[in-house]
């Protein structure tokens, strides 16, 4: 019996998501696994994200950012003396990324209201301390499908976004020329 392979955009999304997360959104829904906070990915897997967790104004996945910061830097966060830590940190983070770029901010972190926050722990070598290995394992890589992103155009979506600790690193707009989808025809986001 000959079977046809799925070559559409959604099938490609499924393959990518299954490879990174371990399951697809549809598989999780069918199994009743909808609690995003109950995830415990192993060292080879990513968290799965929800489009609603993106703060569209500041372009940050709030769930992953704050989960990472609260898990890895609780003592530093306790130094905060202002009135709204999430707004102040997220606003300054967005400004730092806009000014210095994502890579520099991930490497160096940033300071806000007497706190020095790290946003990524680099992969240690085998000779590095146990603490370095633990910190690296606390990074939260995540993948979100069908990510809405615009305050001005609420229906606009990007096929997939890959985040590290809530900060978007890569966006994927999948196109399949076999089905007539091309960047030239469908436009750029």
Language model region names:
Residues 1-189:
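An alpha-helical interface "stripe"
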């Amino acid at each position: 019996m000959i079977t046809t392979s799925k070559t559409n955009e959604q099938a490609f999304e499924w393959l990518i998501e299954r490879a990174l997360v371990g399951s697809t959104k549809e598989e999780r829904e069918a199994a009743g696994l909808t609690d995003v906070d109950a995830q415990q990915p192993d060292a080879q897997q990513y968290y799965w994200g929800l489009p609603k967790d993106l703060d569209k104004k500041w372009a940050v996945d709030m769930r992953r950012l704050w989960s990472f910061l609260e898990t890895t830097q609780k003592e530093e966060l306790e130094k905060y003396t202002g009135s709204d830590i999430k707004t102040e940190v997220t606003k300054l983070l967005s400004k730092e990324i806009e000014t210095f770029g994502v890579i520099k901010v991930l490497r160096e972190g940033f300071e806000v209201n007497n706190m020095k926050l790290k946003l990524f722990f680099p992969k240690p070598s085998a000779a590095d301390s146990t603490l370095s290995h633990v910190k690296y394992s606390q990074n939260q890589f995540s993948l979100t499908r069908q990510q809405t992103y615009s305050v001005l155009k609420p229906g606009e979506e990007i096929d997939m976004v890959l985040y590290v600790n809530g900060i978007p690193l890569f966006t994927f707009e999948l196109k399949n020329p076999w089905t007539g989808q091309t960047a030239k025809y469908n436009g750029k986001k």
